[in-house]
Amino acid sequence: MPLAGFAPVADSQARLLILGSMPGVRSLTAGQYYAGPRNRFWPLMGEFLGFDPAMPYGRRLGEMTDAGIALWDVLQSCEREGSLDASIVESTEVPNDFAAFLEKHSHIRAIAFNGQK
């Protein structure tokens, strides 16, 4: 059964888009980007942007959008056992619509990839 990713987190003034591959099992269960307990994303972003990575998820997202950073994933859906990018079944990959996203978010000037796929 295909896994479905999340909607992007972005406001109209976002300048940087950080892309993962596809949310892991814990993230999908929690309904939150980078929710895995060993994931270093929030501690690193907290250090970089000067916020407490333990603050509630909604506030962390607010810190990101306030800093002009958008979050999304490369894949809209896929099939995968577990959470590893290496386990994604290539023939099931459905990419997100980046052309439409970038048209709507015309201030994006850079895209960073935070995944292996």
Regions found by a protein language model. Give the residues of each.
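A polyanion-binding, active-site-adjacent surface
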Residues: 1-117
